[in-house]
UniProtKB/Swiss-Prot annotation:
UniProt family annotation: Belongs to the class I-like SAM-binding methyltransferase superfamily. mRNA cap 0 methyltransferase family.
Record flagged with keyword Methyltransferase: yes
Quaternary context: Interacts with importin alpha, leading to stimulate both RNA-binding and methyltransferase activity. Interaction with importin alpha and beta is required for its nuclear localization, importin beta dissociating in response to RanGTP, allowing RNMT-importin alpha to bind RNA substrates. Interacts with elongating form of polymerase II and RNGTT. Interacts with RAMAC, this interaction significantly enhances RNA-binding and cap methyltransferase activity.
UniProt protein name: mRNA cap guanine-N(7) methyltransferase
Length: 476
């Protein structure tokens, strides 16, 4: 409890220092005390020229206390955190042969994380930023990073349901998709309680339209889809047209589609109706691309929040910078991961608030540069657009909270977001590594449970547990 209280106070201090960074003309950075172990969580910022000495000293004392306690506080590693629910399992009839399973797998929508927004030179509210911590070569790569991200997603090939169902990360992608579905559904309901009709949504970084069905099920009236990748936007539009033209299709929202870099271009200049307001802006697995610079992050936030109606929400999913750096510092090299995902930084120990680049690779899905999103900084920057943070949870926390709801639990089954364990005699587990299911085997041995269990492999959980969900509300 003492460690938890200190961590909470520590987070508040991080927020104050992020605020100092936004208001000053000095680019700051955050780091982990060099004595931090794998289980430690002691993140800090380098003292900036505008920071008071006593705050920095107090923060250092915090770090020392957190590091000392981290080794004995029993903090779970990603592999130990995996929660098993014996009730969250597919029906027995769904555990037939592998080919049968592939044909039966009907998912709500394409569930590849849509990391489509990108980077560029923001022009709004520019400020001077000291770039001593950023190599000279990196300063000149803004356009290159933007082009790299757009090219990557433009070149991704569409694959059928059959092939996707055979993917090593089939359940991981379904699990991430379930997380988005629950988040979107919950905040659509909040909007509907305030506004009975005519709900308008901005999908910032829409990709190929993986969330279109979610918006349809949410009974919205208008959707604006925008993405940096032109090919992805065209595929998204085609998917929408296919949904609209189905004979048995119910009423579907109206939509417009925009190819633009949301960290470089002002979206209202491209809307059919520049005065249009939104009830929700959804930014799923995207906003980290904009944190190459302050200007880019600010432009992304302006696009996301400026046209939100009072009481509207900016919701999303993004990597948890604290978790990324914790794993990095626990690694013996500048990278970490497993056979599913890898994260590679340029160096340890120095993490600027903007432009802290790392390369992220997820098997067959993502292989592009990303940037750390220091969440206290995002929170502070959002205040400029009259936004208040109303919800933030790690994927683990979000799962544990939402799985208690029976509707969410049933949706988890329908979307096949957890893998049946043990596998049926006619099928096999997605991972061939025995230790990937040690947690499930142990749980099954020590508990009276109904089989099969529903779980993710250890490798998949390590990949998905680097993320968090968030929601900001537009104030009056």
């Amino acid at each position: 409890m003492a460690n938890s209280a200190k961590a909470e106070e520590y987070e508040k201090m991080s927020l104050e220092q992020a605020k100092a960074s936004v208001n000053s003309e000095t680019e700051s950075s955050f780091n982990i005390n060099e004595n931090t172990t794998a289980s430690g969580t002691g993140l800090s910022e380098k003292t900036s020229v505008c920071r008071q000495v006593d705050i920095a000293r107090k923060r250092k004392e915090f770090e020392d206390d957190l590091v000392k306690e981290s080794s004995s506080c029993g903090k779970d590693t990603p592999s130990k955190k995996r929660k098993l629910d014996p009730e969250i399992v597919p029906e027995e009839k769904d555990c037939g042969d592998a080919e049968g399973n592939s044909k039966k797998r009907k998912r709500e929508t394409e569930d590849v994380p849509k990391d489509k927004s990108s980077t560029g030179d923001g022009t709004q509210n520019k400020r001077k930023i000291a770039l001593e911590d950023v190599p000279e070569k990196q300063k000149n790569l803004e356009e290159g990073h933007s082009s790299t991200v757009a090219a990557h997603y433009n070149e991704l090939q569409e694959v059928g349901l059959e092939k996707r169902s055979q993917s090593r990360i089939f359940y991981l992608r379904n699990f991430n998709n379930w997380m988005k579905s629950v988040l979107i559904g919950e905040f659509l309901e909040k909007v509907r309680q305030k506004k009975k009709r005519d709900i308008t949504v901005l999908d910032l970084g829409c990709g190929k339209g993986g969330d279109l069905l979610k918006w349809k099920k949410g009974r919205i009236n208008k959707l604006v889809c925008t993405d940096i990748a032109d090919v992805s936007v065209k595929q998204c539009q085609q998917r929408y047209e296919d949904m609209k033209n189905r004979r048995d299709s119910e009423y579907i929202f109206s939509a417009e589609f925009i190819t633009a870099d949301s960290s470089k271009e002002l979206l209202i200049d491209k809307f059919r109706d520049p005065q249009m307001c939104f009830d929700i802006c959804s930014c799923q697995f995207v906003c980290h691309y904009s944190f190459e610079s302050y200007e880019q992050a600010d432009m992304m936030l302006r696009n996301a929040c400026e046209r939100l109606s009072p009481g509207g929400y900016f919701i999303g999913t993004t990597p948890n910078s604290f978790e990324l750096i914790r794993r990095l510092e626990a690694s013996e090299t500048e990278s970490f991961g497993n056979e599913i995902y890898t994260v590679k930084f340029q160096k340890k120990g120095d993490y600027p608030l903007f432009g802290c680049k790392y390369d992220f690779n997820l098997e067959g899905v993502v292989d592009v540069p990303e940037f750390l999103v220091y969440f206290p900084l995002l929170n502070e920057m959002a205040k400029k657009y009259n936004m208040k943070l109303v919800y933030k949870k790690t994927f683990l926390e979000f799962y544990e909270e939402k799985i208690k709801n029976n509707e969410n639990k049933m949706l988890l089954k329908r979307m096949q977001a957890l893998e049946p364990y043990p596998a049926n005699e006619s099928s096999k587990l997605v991972s061939e590594k025995v230790d990937d299911y040690e947690h499930a085997a142990k749980y099954m041995k020590n508990s009276q449970v109904r089989l099969p269990l529903g779980t993710l492999s250890k490798s998949e959980w390590e990949a998905t547990s680097i993320y968090l969900v968030f929601a900001f509300e537009k104030q009056q």
